[in-house]
Amino acid sequence: MKISYNWLKQYLKLDLAAEETGVILTDLGLEVEGIEPFESVKGGLKGVVVGLVLECEKHPNADKLKITKVDVGQEAPLQIVCGAPNVAKGQKVPVATIGTVLYDHEGKPFEIKKGKIRGEESYGMICAEDELGLGESHEGIMVLDDKYAVGTPCAEVFQVETDEVFEIGLTPNRADAMSHYGVARDLRAGLIQKGVSLELITPSVTKFHVDNRSVKVDIEVTNKKLVPRYTGVAISNVRVGESPAWLQNRLKAIGITPKNNVVDATNYVLHGLGQPLHAFDADHIVGRKLIVKTAEAGTAFTTLDGVKRTLDAEDLMICDAEKPLCIAGVLGGQDSGVTHSTRNVFLESAYFDPVSVRKTAKRHSISTDASYRFERGINIEDCKYALMYAAVLIENIAGGVISSDVIDFYPKKKDDFQVFLAFENVDKLIGQKIPRDTIKSILHSLDIKVSSLTERGLGLLIPSYRVDVQREADVIEEILRIYGYNNISFSEKINASMSHSSKYDDLNMQNVVAAQLTGQGYYEIMTNSLVSEKEITSYEAAPEEAVKLLNPLSSDLGYMRTNLLFSGLEVVSYNINRKRSDLRLFEFGKNYRLSGGKYDEQKHLLLYLTGNQLPQSWTTTPRPVSFFELKGSVEALFERLGLKEVTTLPLEPTDNVAAEGFRWMYGETLLGTMGVVKHKILKDFDIKQEVLYADLHWDTLLEQVRGHKVVYKEISKYPEVRRDLALLLDDKVSFADLYRVAFATEKSILKQINLFDVYQGDKLAAGKKSYAVSFILQEENKTLTDKQIDKTMQKLQTAFEQSLGATLRE
């Protein structure tokens, strides 16, 4: 936000340097990010003076050039070659002396140097208005009034104004400071705390007077919730034209291009007082009635920027008897504004619901100075005052007379918000006891009234313009802000309390899992959640569930992704194309769907494995990554999270991603899937090597983890015992089945089961296979006996025979 120092000093008579003021504003929380000089004429016309043309003779070597002698107040006149057709002896003219840097009307700089033109020396330049940056005309030199003395700086002649402009990084909650008056109000409070008492100068509206009632415009508000206050007044016989220099300079200083005196007046009030206004051409209001209502869905409407928009049923509009004129609080319509032919103006000043304005502005991708303020909340009590001030200003600079009473639709006055401030809480939150009189003084400087006083604290009434102060903590923050953060002493002692929660925090769990995966050589990636329509139509089984953006940044980013996998494959492809083909990647991200008319977001964890397990070296040969390597990484995660009874099932037939793979199950709950990406999909991403993936449903995983308590115990000091079995099984029986039956049978001393050999061949019957399995047994409190070991192994063997039809292989 840009704040002009000259403008600021209209409300507060400051004699501080801009840098000092900037420091105070920053201390108050209005961070000054920079201070830039401003000149109403770029370059400030430094080096340009009033000259008197003493002689004007024809150039001997050029028909269109003249040689002049010009007195600029130096010891001797300057010889200047000039090509302007209107230059003549006896004229007072602006002269740019050697070394002067001028800026033309487009802002391009050029330096005046000694030169030789067609054989004749020239020691300066007699200037046209475009060369000085004062206009666009180049028809001839500027001829000045004879009253100006020779040598007078042209900066004085043209009343060049200099200013310093603060660039303030305003936080979104500070709606009260989104104007010069608001900044001045805050600055005054800070100065009072420093012992400097200044009067805050509020612009007067005492000259507001209804001259006649010749222009009648009625108002109808259909939704009091969205429009709690609407004011307006008519001004007739205005003359729309150029604004006076002082007003143009104020607007130019903060980057606003002057339009005409009426529009400039509304912008001046907007940036001066913080109240957005709109000026209608009253003669274009059909039926002389404004109706504030929501739009009919699908209505076409062209805004001031020339863009044709389709309105939504929730868009709040200002309409006349036939058509919409404005998107309330956002932007006017193409035919609603003031033009040079306008003679009668209806001025609007209103309060529109912040949420409604924000939704409409976002829906149509519009951001204006008005919507920026309405979205954050303006001062509802200032609507009428700002309207009257703007009307008086327009009278002064555009002529005309006020031709109606002020219409003020304000059915329910908004009461000041009440907060109780406990002194104990002030001391506790700030960490230091602030004198009670100081607290009261600060509150008074902030216009926060004390409605009641007790030993415990203060009852307060918050002014209407402080829409961000709603709680006791907000008031305490305001006290601290004005008191000064630098005035709070910090104790060398640290007081802290230890807290423990049994709940699993999403971010903490992400960090735990990320640490484990990075320890295994995986790299975390982050991808864009926006995808193309092609991705949705190519891979999504239910494309109607995809979430489409209303205003995409580009056609390639028109949808929210439905599957995180494809975002990761883009990263895999990108790296492979840059000769990094051995990849271990993981990503936490969300999938987005529209289900049953509601938006659904599901968080996933994706792992990707491709290329070689180890790089080639003199001790190793390249070995491709394996399905079991990725499976081991996932199982290690489950173990780290305390999920020990995870099983696998074949993929659903409807799975359209994996060529082969399986599902991870925890009881009846699906935790995720794992597999090899289909060749067709890899081809679409220009990937020519196998890619393994694991897709874990992170939200579901956390739900299961929350039900588990991680228990730490001492490592047993008693020895482990290993026993092996060679089991003959049906082809359909998996190691996971063996694993499940084993731990269901023996939970006490069975610690581990491993598959170390698989055999299928001619020596076995058709449909049979042999598993060689090792079992690790251990007792926590004593050494296992042979009898105990044999009994356990027999129990396991019997369970395998009964549950899986297994037999011992001879």
Where are these regions (language model features)?
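Glycine/proline-enriched, intrinsically flexible loops and inter-domain linkers
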Residues: 5, 23, 27-28, 40, ...
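A carboxyl-terminal module marker
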Residues: 2, 27, 445-448, 468, ...
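Phosphate-backbone binding interfaces of nucleic-acid-interacting proteins
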Residues: 1-211, 346, 369, 379-380, ...
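Extended, well-folded interaction surfaces typified by the phenylalanyl-tRNA synthetase beta subunit core
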Residues: 419-581, 723, 776-781, 788, ...
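Conserved mixed alpha/beta core segments that line enzyme active sites in large multi-domain catalysts
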Residues: 49-80, 151, 260, 266-335
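Mobile "lid/hinge" segments at catalytic clefts and subdomain interfaces of large enzymes
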Residues: 118-133, 137-143, 155-164, 168, ...
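Beta-rich nucleic-acid/ligand-interaction surfaces
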Residues: 40-44, 207-209, 497-498, 502, ...
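Terminal amphipathic helices with adjacent charged low-complexity linkers/tails
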Residues: 187, 191-221, 398-426, 432-433
